[in-house]
Amino acid sequence: MGRIGGPAFRYPPGYAYQRWTVGLLLPAIFLSQAYYYDGYAALGLYPPPPGSRWVRYGPDLLLVNLTTGRVEDVAYGVFL
């Protein structure tokens, strides 16, 4: 997996970095276009299955089921 620079990530008010793991529920505020990341192929990540999206959370990418908000996979430290 590659690492890239990117625009500074701004957490919504009341949120700060936390290390997400598979099975946790991501708050609904992050299940929006503002946090979706479509450049996963350039990082060597696989396409999300139907109903899921790669979501940026600080330096990490989370694969999240959009119906449940459950984290399905995590790529740590993708963004510098």
Where are these regions (language model features)?
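Low-complexity segments
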Residues: 1-80
